[in-house]
């Protein structure tokens, strides 16, 4: 029961915080699906496709395909939620060809990386490091675009450290995306601040209709500016979503040279849909539209101006700038001017204890949360209360690390088990995000 609740909570309340628990520890036991449950899953996925998918005709076609497959008995042997989800994903992907559209199972283990474990690194609000290199070159690596309230202060600090650089290298080779508003803010450092520049639009489908709404993103004033200075953007085939948007925007505005690989090819913003029966889905509800090109990079990726293997992108950029060509930023750096925070924010441990106490009693302090996080907490309160009742008395809260999005991660021990809890505090000190996952230790 506890593992099942944890799965629901990790899906439901994970806001901008990324859980740090190993994937293997997050796999609850599967509950087999009977015919009625399979029918319910297909019905809910179909409804989400018809009502929310950004391209209504494609959503209708995909929904019809899985409905026909169900009626033909093609899913009759798929009692395991992971097996059903995998087949549904394959059937829908064959129609939509959308990398942001995903159907999966809570109990499915994460696949092992094809080339061994991914290299570990620390980031704060998506910023890994900023360095001054020889030749007046500034370097910054950005691996994600969290909401602007969290991204801006960290980016401002990192970019201030690069002030005076004659050339800028921005590394998004490991960037998986995020907020389009934060993408626009990073672009803002590269363009003149005399008047706002239209950077990107997100065209969103109004759920249940064929109507669309448009949100435009423009440049904003920045504390330092690199307008008019040469810019190099490093890309890889792992650069995705918002990371791709940044590269695409820079290219469309003719504000930099892209060096590296064609990016992943995902331009449609997505959101979670509650399916139930151990199945989860993310359904793209919008599309990016660049005001210069009137299109985006969906399905194609962003073409670099200088195509080289991602591992060589920094080396090639440095060589083009007349510097010693090295692939490792640590070797190229003369001075690291920004490093991620490695200690918890004041108040984050108290926030974790407050969340535990509120969920245990069934009376959270919603006034200590942002409105969005308070709404999510209300939705999942009964499950959280059941979980904490099973865990028993709180014994200890021990800081572990700062996660990639700037959340503080803690090991939380109880009388009957342990959790990994992350909490994200907003600029006003309110709890703005959080996640719960099993501990990797004994008894988890």
Predicted feature locations:
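Short, well-ordered alpha-helical segments enriched in acidic and aromatic residues
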Residues: 62-68, 355-377
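Short, low-complexity N-terminal intrinsically disordered segments enriched in polar/charged residues
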Residues: 29-41, 325-358
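Bacterial N-terminal signal peptides
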Residues: 8-17
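Gly/Ser/Thr-rich loop/hinge elements
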Residues: 177-230, 268-274, 286-291
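Terminal peptide-recognition signature
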Residues: 45, 92, 140, 170, ...
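Surface-exposed, charged secondary-structure patches
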Residues: 383-433
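Solvent-exposed loop/turn segments at secondary-structure junctions
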Residues: 107-110, 144-148, 174-180, 196-197, ...
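Extended, small/polar residue-biased N-terminal targeting/export presequences
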Residues: 56-135, 376-386, 392-398
